[in-house]
C-alpha cells in the first residue's frame, strides 16, 4: 500500500454488505468468512465472521480499509475450527469459479464472453485501464477442490487472466473497499479507487 493514497476516499458499506451476502448466501453454520487486511510495510491482520455477522464483517472492512489497508476475503467458506490463516487443504467446497482480469484488455474479454452467466462482477479499478473480478456460481457446490483448481486453470487459459488464481484459499479483493495501489503501481499510473459491485448489470451502492 502506498502512503500517498487519497484520504478522501472511503469504503462503501452497502457495496461491501452486498458482496458478503452473495458470497455467503448458501453457507452453513459451520462455515465462516476469513478476511485479511494487507499493506506495504504493514503487519497483516486476519478476522473471521459467521454467516449471521455480515454487519460486523462489513463494519470491520470499513474500519480497517479506511486505515489504509487493502481488504481481501477468502472466497470459499472456511470451517470454523480451522487455524488462522486458512490454507488450501482447509478449503472443502467451492460455490464459485472466478477470474481476476488485471491485465489490459482482459476485463473486456471476460465481459464479452458467453461461456457463463456472471453472478457478480467486482470492478477493482479503472485507471490506467479497466480491471475486474468476475464470479460464476455453480448450480451445486463443488467438493472436489482438485477439479475446481483444474477448472480455474481452464478459465485462465481461455481468458488470459491472472495465472495465479487457482488455489482454493485464494484471497480476492472485497467489493466496496478502497483499492490502494503499491508504490510501484502508482508509478505506472494506477490510482486509489473505491471498488464497485455489479449484480445483474446493476451497481450495488
Model-derived features with residue positions:
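N-terminal accessory/precursor segments of enzymes
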Residues: 84-86, 118-125
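DNA replication initiation modules
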Residues: 76-114, 138-205
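Structural alpha-beta junctions
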Residues: 26-29, 59-69, 112-120, 156-162
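Short, conserved phosphate-binding/catalytic loop or strand-edge motifs used
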Residues: 121-133, 172
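Intrinsically disordered, low-complexity coil segments
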Residues: 42-43, 127-128, 186
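DNA replication initiation on ssDNA origins
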Residues: 1-96, 170, 178, 196-199
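Short loop/turn segments at strand-loop or loop-helix junctions that form parts
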Residues: 36-38, 100-102, 124-126, 176
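N-terminal cationic amphipathic segment used for targeting or macromolecule association
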Residues: 1, 15, 119-120, 190
Amino acid at each position: 500500500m502506498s502512503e500517498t493514497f487519497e484520504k478522501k476516499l472511503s469504503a462503501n458499506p452497502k457495496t461491501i454488505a452486498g458482496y458478503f451476502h452473495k458470497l455467503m448466501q448458501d453457507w452453513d453454520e459451520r462455515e465462516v468468512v476469513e478476511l485479511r487486511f494487507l499493506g506495504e510495510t504493514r503487519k497483516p491482520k486476519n478476522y473471521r465472521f459467521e454467516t449471521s455477522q455480515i454487519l460486523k464483517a462489513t463494519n470491520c472492512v470499513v474500519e480497517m480499509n479506511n486505515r489504509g489497508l487493502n481488504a481481501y476475503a477468502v472466497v470459499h467458506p472456511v470451517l470454523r475450527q480451522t487455524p488462522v490463516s486458512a490454507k488450501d487443504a482447509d478449503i472443502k467446497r467451492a460455490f464459485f469459479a472466478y477470474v481476476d482480469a488485471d491485465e489490459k484488455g482482459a476485463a473486456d474479454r471476460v465481459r464479452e464472453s458467453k461461456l457463463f452467466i456472471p453472478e457478480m462482477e467486482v470492478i477493482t479499478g479503472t485507471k490506467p485501464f479497466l480491471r475486474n473480478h468476475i464470479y460464476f456460481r455453480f448450480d451445486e457446490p463443488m467438493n472436489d477442490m482438485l477439479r475446481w483448481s483444474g477448472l480455474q486453470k481452464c478459465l485462465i487459459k481461455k481468458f488470459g487472466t491472472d495465472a495465479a488464481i487457482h488455489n482454493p484459499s485464494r484471497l480476492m479483493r472485497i467489493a466496496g473497499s478502497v483499492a490502494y495501489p503499491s508504490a510501484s503501481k502508482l508509478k505506472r499510473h494506477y490510482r486509489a479507487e473505491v471498488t464497485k459491485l455489479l449484480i445483474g448489470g446493476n451497481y450495488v451502492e
